[in-house]
Each structure stands twice: as C-alpha cells, then as structure tokens.
Regions:
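Active-site- and interface-proximal helix/loop "cap" or "latch" segments in soluble metabolic
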Residues: 22-80, 93-94
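A generic structural micro-environment signature
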Residues: 12, 25, 47, 51, ...
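Short, compact, well-ordered microdomains
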Residues: 2, 72-103
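Generic preference for hydrophobic/aromatic residues in regular secondary structure cores
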Residues: 17-19, 63, 99-102
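Short, charged/polar N-terminal "headpieces" of proteins
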Residues: 1-27
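Glycine-rich beta-alpha junction loops
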Residues: 10, 33-35, 86
Length: 105
C-alpha cells in the first residue's frame, strides 16, 4: 500500500490517500478528507487503472477526468497526490515528498 497525506494549503483541509495494487493494472483507492468536494470524489474514485491514469495526456487521465466532475478548484493538489501514490504503488517512482513553497513579495 502507498500513502500520501496532503495539507492542501489555505483551505485548511487535510486529505489522506491510500492506493493498494489489486489485479493487473488496477488499484483500490481510499481517500479520507473533511473537504466536501474530495469526499464526493472519493465516492466515485474507488478503483483506478494505472495505465488509464498515468500514460495519457493530463486532460485524458482517468484521475483528472473523474476529478473534473467534483473539484472546482483547479489548483487543488489532491489529484496530483493520487497520481504520486499510484506511481509509488506500481513501482514507477520511489516514495519522495513533494514540496511547494509559496510566497508573495
């Protein structure tokens, strides 16, 4: 199982993502969050195919197609975090934290 904890930023929501490889190219996805949009997303995104998520243009990724139905904030980091968990779970990347430092001068 691969896990990602997302502190989304100014919204204050934390999302916990778990991806668990099942058969072939499929994985179970479990997302827990207090964000209503992420909760709605998690109700549909319970299983994904890594090929349909990782090897398509961003707009055609299974993750982003489902995300587009529920999340109205384009800069939400959760969809990217789901893909990062998928990468790690299927051995496409090593587990490594991603950091964004945002400043305004």
């Amino acid at each position: 199982m691969s896990k990602v904890k997302v502190h989304a930023g100014i919204c204050g929501f934390v999302s916990n993502i778990k991806v668990n490889k099942t058969e072939g190219k499929n994985a179970k996805v479990k997302i827990v969050s207090a964000c209503g949009m992420i909760k709605d997303l998690s109700n549909e995104m319970t299983e994904i195919n890594w090929i349909n998520s990782m090897t398509r243009e961003m707009a055609n990724s299974e993750v982003y197609k489902i995300t587009d139905k529920y999340i109205t904030h384009a800069a939400c980091p959760v969809p990217s975090a789901i893909l990062k968990a998928v990468e790690v779970e299927f051995g496409l990347a090593l587990p490594k934290d991603v950091t964004m430092k945002i400043e305004k001068d």
